From Swiss-Prot:
CDD domains: YqgF. Its main location: cytoplasm. GO terms for cellular component: cytosol. PANTHER family: POLYNUCLEOTIDYL TRANSFERASE, RIBONUCLEASE H-LIKE SUPERFAMILY PROTEIN (PTHR33317:SF4). Its EC number is 3.1.-.-. GO terms for molecular function: nuclease activity. Could be a nuclease involved in processing of the 5'-end of pre-16S rRNA. Pfam families: RuvX (PF03652). This is Putative pre-16S rRNA nuclease. It comes from Salmonella dublin (strain CT_02021853). It is found in: Cytoplasm.
Length: 138
């Protein structure tokens, strides 16, 4: 077991990606994947899985601030189920509330408005989702 995890920040146009190690509790962004109405290029996902060979995949679960589901919640669940169904890897959903806000803030601090491109924000959100998962002791 390599203790490598891959995280996705699901979106309808762009899906953020991060890779992390359970042993260090750290994650780093990978290039975001473009999506067509929430459907990714599955061959790109397959390549990521072959390259990184994660033990587990974490998919951010978008919830409202009060914990209730929103329209994107069901789509993120469907994305997670499809990954599990296609590739047979363990997939865990993890609360992603405020991850995009935190990602935008961090990127802006480091590079101003120029740093706020969509793919960077989505992958930075995936890093935050994965690090939050590690912080909760998983």
């Amino acid at each position: 077991m390599s203790d490598t995890l891959l995280a996705f920040d699901f979106g309808t146009k762009s899906i953020g990606v991060a890779i992390g190690q359970r042993i260090t509790g750290t994650a780093r962004p990978l290039p975001a994947i473009k999506a067509q109405d929430g459907t990714p290029d599955w061959m790109l996902i397959e390549r990521l899985l072959k390259e990184w060979q994660p033990d587990e995949i974490i998919v951010g679960l978008p919830l409202n601030m009060d914990g209730t589901e929103q329209p994107l919640t069901a789509r993120a669940r469907k994305f997670a189920n499809r990954i599990h169904g296609r590739f047979g890897v363990t997939v865990t959903l993890h609360d992603e509330r405020l991850s995009t806000v935190e990602a935008r803030s961090g990127l802006f601090e480091r590079g101003g408005y120029r740093a706020l491109n969509k793919g960077k924000v989505d992958s930075a959100s995936a890093v935050i989702i994965l690090e939050s998962y590690f912080e909760q002791g998983y």
